[in-house]
Structure formats: structure tokens, C-alpha cells
Regions:
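N-terminal Sec-pathway targeting helices
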Residues: 1-16
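Ser/Thr-rich, Proline-interspersed low-complexity disordered segments
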Residues: 19-20, 24, 32-116, 120-124, ...
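Boundary/entry segment of secreted carbohydrate-active catalytic domains
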Residues: 104-164
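Aromatic-rich peripheral "rim/lid" segments of glycoside hydrolase catalytic domains that contact
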Residues: 109-123, 132-140, 339-348, 353-356, ...
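Acidic (Asp/Glu)-rich catalytic clusters
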Residues: 121-125, 145-152, 166-182, 200-209, ...
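Acidic-and-aromatic substrate-binding clefts and catalytic sites of carbohydrate-active enzymes
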Residues: 133-145, 157-170, 187-197, 220-223, ...
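Substrate-binding cleft of extracellular glycoside hydrolase catalytic domains
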Residues: 163, 170-263, 327
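Aromatic- and acid-rich polysaccharide-binding/catalytic face
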Residues: 184, 217, 257-258, 267-308, ...
Length: 422
């Protein structure tokens, strides 16, 4: 091969080397990659060259300049070493509880043609003296005897327990004839629904008797529930509200009875939340005012014949009004010595205490010196007649309590006076 040919080959090789150097500069190839590139280029150039060795000039690579950041480039600083974080173990989240919706109370459908009653608007017996008695467990033959006894003691009120409509049909006309106003209490347990209030009220109205209806009795006592039925406040209140609605709509007077403040308060609030506020002014309350062996003027707590005052305060506080009250059970425990600060109730005290109680309505003054309140319509203590009860005025196994009955008879006849008159 001629020198000219060799020169051309060497020139071509030099051109290849220059091109490779430019590629290195552009691509930023490292110094370790450059010899391989040169070797590849040399091999390609010498494929057609003669075997005469030709010295290859040494290419000195210049450092590749680092490109300046452009104006549009975003500078990202190298991350600083973060402080070591210790993970705090946490309890796994529990299941999310769905909020329990508050049920909307069912609303009472009440008739709108019954006016609210003032105390003086309520029906009372002729020649009312506020004296009464509790009476139960009667049959037709016994009824005549017991009503005669009530008349002998000049009782004008009675709390009467009845078992069904047949008793009402039998008893109502006889009490009407005797001039005795009755609070009627249907025999029911606290968990029993009752659907015949309207029928019972119609029987009384047809007999000319004011329909004072007591719905249920002492619901906070286990004795008023079946053994298999656990006491359930809201089950009872629902039944009571239903009964109150039915009595009201039938034209009756709605009687409530409680011996525990919380249930009574809850029931009053429930009556309002169910839309039953109209009933407030056509309802009455039946306190049970048992005095144990406390004297008539005892008013330190609810265990007194003055215990109705406690419930009057509760009604005033909760609904701003004290309804009529007819004490349906109460009086003294014959032979009682529950409170050792006071003497045992013997026959002498039994007669003195009852004479003092019934004299409230004649004198217009309670035993503790307070005025007799208009809302206290009557006091019907436990009990007119029972062969098994020591407190019974008649037929008791302990005797007939003759001194007590004589003390009551000794009080002069009178007619109860209210703040508005008789």
C-alpha cells in the first residue's frame, strides 16, 4: 500500500477519535469508558489497513465541563439526614360505632273538646267532708254490709278495687245511692296492658258516677310484677301513657299512683314528650301516706300521714301545678313500733291519731299547723274490712277497733270548706 493510502487511513482514524471525544463530552462518559470506545474505533479503521503498524497518536481528554443550570431548572437540595424516629405502638382502631338514633316518641291523639279543670271544677260528693276509706275484695252480699258501715262512719269517699266490668255494674249504682264518690282501681299488675277503659268509664257514667280511674298501683314494688317479669320502668311508663290516653279520651279522670320519685318524674316528662300535656289538668294523684308509728304531726320524711306534701312539692316543681289528691292507702300500723323515738301504736293512740287526721277537714288545719290544702280532696286510709289485717276497721282478727270508730263518730258533722267556698 502506498504512503498516500496509509495517510488517508490515519486521517480517517483521527476523525473517528475526534468524533468519539465529542460524544464523550456531550454524553458525560467517564474516563473508564473512553478506552473501550477508542479501541472499537481503531479496530474499525484498521480492518482495511495494511499490516504495517502505524503509531496512533495519544488523545488527551479534557475534563468535561459541568453544564450551568438553566433559568428554568428547579434546584433540589440534597436531603438532610433525618433524626431517627422511634415508632410508638398504637392500639389498632376498633370498629366505628354507628350513633344510635334517638327514637321519635309516638304522639298521643287526644280529643280537643275537654276543657282544663280548676280544682273547684272537679266533681265531689254532696256534703263533702273529705273522709274516706280503702275498700276491696267484695261480693254482692258483702257490698250492702260494707256500704252501710261507710255510711255509719260518714265516709264520703272510697278507694275501691274492682276485678271486672261486672263488679262495676253491681257496685256503681249502690255507691251512687249512698252519696259516696269512688276512685276506681282496676286489678292489674304493672306489666299488664288493659284495653277496656272506655267500656268501664261508660258503665260509671251511665250509673251517674264521676269516672275517677286509677291506672296501676305501686309499680316500683316487686309485688306488682310477676316473678318471671323483671321490673322495667319504660315498659310500665309506656303502658301508663297508653292507659292515660284511653281514660282521657273516654272522658274519665286520669289517676296516677307512685311511691318512688324517679319513676313519677320520668312519667311526667314522658307524658309531655308524647304530646300529653292536656292530661295534666285532668289528672289526679293517689298518694299512699303510711305513718308507721309516727304521730299525725310528723313531717320529717315521706313516712307520715303528711307524706302527700312531698308529692305536692314534686308536682309543683315538675309541672308547675299540684293536681287533686285522694290518698288511696295510708294511716297507721296498728301495733307498729318502727321508729324507736315514738311509742308503739296501741288502741288508744290508734283512735287518737285517726280522730286527729279526720279533723283536718273540719278545722282546715293539718296536724303540723299548715293550712289544709285545697288540692287534698280526701284521705282513704287502709282498710275498711279484712279478717287477716290488724289495721282493718271491721272484722280484724285483733278486734273491731271500737275506740277508733267511736272517736271518729264523736267529731261533729260538717261540710268541707275550700278557699273558694264549699
Amino acid at each position: 500500500m502506498s504512503r498516500k493510502t496509509v495517510a488517508l487511513a490515519a486521517g480517517g482514524c483521527l476523525i473517528i477519535l475526534l468524533v468519539a471525544a465529542c460524544a464523550v463530552a456531550v454524553a458525560g462518559l467517564s474516563a473508564f469508558e473512553l478506552p473501550s470506545l477508542i479501541a472499537g474505533a481503531t479496530a474499525t479503521a484498521t480492518q482495511t489497513a495494511v499490516s504495517t503498524p502505524t503509531p496512533i497518536p495519544t488523545l488527551t481528554s479534557s475534563p468535561t465541563p459541568v453544564p450551568s443550570p438553566s433559568a428554568s431548572a428547579t434546584f433540589t437540595p440534597a436531603p438532610s439526614p433525618a433524626a431517627e424516629t422511634v415508632a410508638t405502638p398504637t392500639a389498632p382502631p376498633g370498629p366505628t360505632k354507628e350513633p344510635k338514633p334517638t327514637p321519635t316518641p309516638w304522639l298521643m291523639q287526644l280529643r280537643d273538646d275537654l276543657p282544663p279543670l280548676r280544682l273547684q271544677d272537679w266533681p265531689r260528693p254532696p256534703d263533702d267532708n273529705g273522709w274516706g276509706i280503702h275498700f276491696q275484695y267484695f261480693n254482692e252480699g258483702d257490698l250492702e254490709v260494707q256500704i252501710a258501715r261507710m255510711k255509719e262512719l260518714r265516709f264520703k269517699w272510697a278507694l275501691v278495687v274492682y276485678g271486672d266490668e261486672n263488679f262495676l255494674r253491681m257496685a256503681a249504682p249502690r255507691f251512687k245511692e249512698a252519696g259516696i264518690v269512688v276512685v276506681w282501681r282496676r286489678t292489674l299488675q304493672a306489666h299488664d296492658p288493659y284495653y277496656d277503659w272506655a267500656r268501664d268509664i261508660k258503665i260509671l257514667q251511665e250509673a251517674g258516677m264521676p269516672p275517677y280511674m286509677q291506672a296501676y298501683n305501686e309499680p316500683t314494688l316487686q309485688a306488682e310484677w310477676d316473678e318471671e317479669q323483671e321490673m322495667d320502668e319504660w315498659l310500665f311508663i309506656d303502658l301508663l301513657l297508653t292507659a292515660s290516653r284511653d281514660i282521657y279520651n273516654a272522658g274519665g279522670y286520669v289517676g296516677w299512683q307512685f311511691v318512688e320519685d324517679e319513676w313519677l318524674t320520668d312519667a311526667l316528662h314522658a307524658l309531655k314528650s308524647h304530646g300529653g300535656e292536656r292530661i295534666y289538668r285532668r289528672m289526679f294523684f293517689v298518694p299512699h301516706a303510711y305513718g308507721l308509728n309516727h304521730p299525725p304531726d310528723y313531717d320529717e320524711d315521706v313516712n307520715a300521714v303528711l307524706g302527700f306534701l312531698h308529692y305536692a312539692d314534686l308536682f309543683q316543681r315538675e309541672i308547675g301545678y299540684v293536681p287533686p289528691m285522694v290518698v288511696g292507702e295510708g294511716g297507721w300500723k296498728y301495733g307498729g313500733d318502727d321508729d324507736n323515738r315514738f311509742p308503739k301504736v296501741d288502741e288508744k293512740l290508734y283512735s287518737e291519731y285517726y280522730a286527729a287526721l279526720y279533723n283536718w277537714f273540719r278545722s282546715g288545719v293539718l296536724s303540723n299547723g299548715q293550712p289544709l290544702p285545697d288540692y287534698l280532696f280526701a284521705f282513704c286510709p287502709w282498710i275498711l274490712s279484712s279478717p287477716t289485717d290488724p289495721n282493718a276497721f271491721y272484722d280484724s282478727f285483733v278486734g273491731d277497733h271500737a275506740p277508733t270508730k267511736e272517736a271518729i263518730k264523736a267529731l261533729p258533722p260538717f261540710k268541707r270548706k275550700f278557699s273558694w267556698g264549699f
